[in-house]
């Protein structure tokens, strides 16, 4: 494992700031687990009420190989914490990230546009022109078949802490219709639960944007590889790095061979 990632892992949850991060992650993961279970029950209930069957199943991975996957800062911090507790999932992500990053480099224009508009879309603040621009760039991104680096053999390696955007939608159509090239794709039926993300559990220090969304694999990797430096790049969180790196416990850890 790269030295910078190992170091960031060692100092992530020590000292006053680190303990605040860890408390947040533990509470957030626990809360999100309950919310996700409620989402799953709601989707199952709504499908049954419509006399439909949810056709999503482990091993498919079509959505994970097509769609842009966004997550909030809170979700990405929780994923990082979970990865630190699950060594094989962490190692696999680090092995696959470069391939994913190389693919999104070719999609930089549409990805940047999506990142700029995603928060407005999720919070229903986008204009009609912005909605059209968002959909156009999403179509461009989806046509590239960029597989999520957390997908392995059609299954999510971080399923327990997967983003809400992944948990909130299911297909009611035959699985083969999910393919972009399938002639019946436009006839697909989806079932979706809208989450009030504006009311999601806030980060333990509130960033200036209020709710920060990013391409999930990118922000997760940034936190793993850059640690507090990545968090300090977020408006409103600049002080975190200074507070953490001057903490006596962190300084003592840094002096260790």
Positions of predicted regions on the chain:
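Short loop/turn segments that flank or connect secondary-structure elements
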Residues: 1-257
